[in-house]
Amino acid sequence: MKDMTQGKPLKLIICFAIPMLIGNIFQQIYNVADTVIVGRFLGESALAGVGSTGTLTYFLLALVSGMCNGAGLVVAQCFGCGNKERLAKTVTALVWVAGVLTCIMSLIGIFGAEFFLRLLSVPENVIGYSAEYLHIIYTFVFGSVIYNGCAAILNSVGDSKTPLRAVIASSVVNIAFDLFFIIVCKMGVAGAAYATILAQCTSAVICFVKVWKVRAEIGLSLMKWKPEAGYIHLVVKTGFPAAFQSCMIALGGMSVQRLVNSFGSSTMAAYVAANRVDSVAIQVIVSIGTALSVFTGQNIAKNQYDRIREALYKTLGVMVGASIFIASMVLIFRVQLMMLFLDANESGEAIGIGCTYLTIIGVAYVIAGVMQSYQNVIRGAGDVNTCMVAGLTELSGRIVFAYLLSGILGVTGIWIATPLSWSCGCIIPVIRYYSGKWKHKRLA
C-alpha cells in the first residue's frame, strides 16, 4: 500500500503508474494473443467474429466495472484520511452490489447474445463464431468481475504491484491455453474463449488472495459482511455515473461497430486488429491518468490542492512527451503491426484499411493525453457527475462524427471521428478544473 499524500508528486505518480502500465500492457497482450492466434490459425472470418463481440462484452460488464471504479474513489479517499471503518463498509457494499449485477448481466449475455449480434448487423458468415464466443464468456464471467473489484480496491490503497503480478500470470495462462486449445485440441473459437476464462480466473484468485491478506490493514472483517443501506446507496451513487458513462461508451462503440460491420468482414477484421494495436499503444496514457486519479483522491482527502495542481501540470508534460513518442512508433511500424494479425497474401485489403486507422489515431494521441489528465483529476476529486457529462459529450461526438463523415469519406470518416470526439471530451474537464468547483466534491 502507498501513501501519496507525502513526497514528490510526479515521482509518486510515475512509480505507481509503472507497475500498472506493465500490468495493463500484459492484459492487452493476451487480448492481442487471442487476436493473432485466431486470425492466423482460424482465418479472417473467425477474427471478425470474435472481434465483433468486444463492444457487447464491454457493454454488459460496464455496469459492474463502473460500480467498482466508483467505489474505488471512495476507498482511495477513505484510505487517504485513515478512515478504515468507512473503507470496510464501502467494500462490503461493493461486494453485494457487484454480485447481484453480475448475475443479471450474465443471464442477459447468455440468453440475448444472438439478438444483440443481429442488432449490430454482424454478417451471417461470422455470426456463428461471435455467438459461440459470447455464450462461453458470459457463462463464466465471475472471474473477470472478481479481478476488477479486487484490483480496484488494491489500486485505491496504492498497491499496483499485485494487479501487475496477476495480469502477467493471466497473460501467460491465456497464451499457453490459446495455443493448446486452438492448435493442439482444434477447439476453434471456443478454445479462445476458454483460454480467456482460465486467464481471468487466474488473475481473480491472485488479487483476491492479496485483499484477503491485507484485510486487517484496511479494516475488513469476516464478521462484518452484512451490507448497510447507507453504504449500498453510497456505492450506487458514486458508481452510477461511471457505470452509466461506461454503458454509454459501450453503446457508442456498438453504434460504431454496427457502422463498421456494414462495410464487410475485411473492414471488421482491420478494425479488430488495429484496435488491438491502439489498445496497447494508449496504455501509457491510461496508466498515468489512473495514477493521477488515485493521487488526487488521496490528496483531496487532506485538502492538499497545491500538490494536485503541481501533479497535474507535471503529468501533462509527461503525457505530451509520451504521446509523441508512441505516435511515432505506431506510424513507423504500422504495416508490420497489422501483419502480426493478418496474412499479407490473403488480407491485403484489411491491412491497408487498418494502416489508415492507425495513422489517423496515432497523430491524435496528444489530445488523448490532455483529456486523460484533466478528466482523472476531476474523477479523483469525486466530481463523478462532471466526468459522466464529459464522457457523454465525447461519446455523442464520436457517434455523430462517425455517421456524418462515413457518408462523405467512407470508412475513413469513422476513423477521423475518434480524434474529433477526444477534442470534445477535453472541453468540459478543462473548464471544470479551472472553475475550482471540483474541490468541493470529495466523497470521504
Q: Where are each of the predicted segments found?
A:
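Short alpha-helical transmembrane segments in multi-pass integral membrane proteins
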Residues: M1-A17, V75-F142, V184-F240, T296-A364, ...
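Residue-level signal for short hydrophobic patches within transmembrane helices
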Residues: Q6, L10-I29, A33, L56, ...
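Transmembrane helical elements of multi-pass membrane transporters/channels
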Residues: C15-D34, I136, Y147, S170, ...
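Transmembrane alpha-helix boundary and packing residues in multipass membrane permease domains
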Residues: M20, N24, V36, L73, ...
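Helix-terminus/linker motif at the lipid-water interface of multi-pass membrane proteins
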Residues: I25, I29-A48, L117-E124, F180-M187, ...
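Small-residue-rich hydrophobic transmembrane alpha-helices
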Residues: L47-L107, S144-P163, A270-I332, A368-A390
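Hydrophobic transmembrane alpha-helices of multi-pass small-molecule transporters
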Residues: F59, N174-D178, A204-F208, V280-Q283, ...
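Short runs within selected transmembrane alpha-helices of multi-pass transporters and secretion channels
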Residues: C68, I136-N155, P163-S171, A192-V205, ...
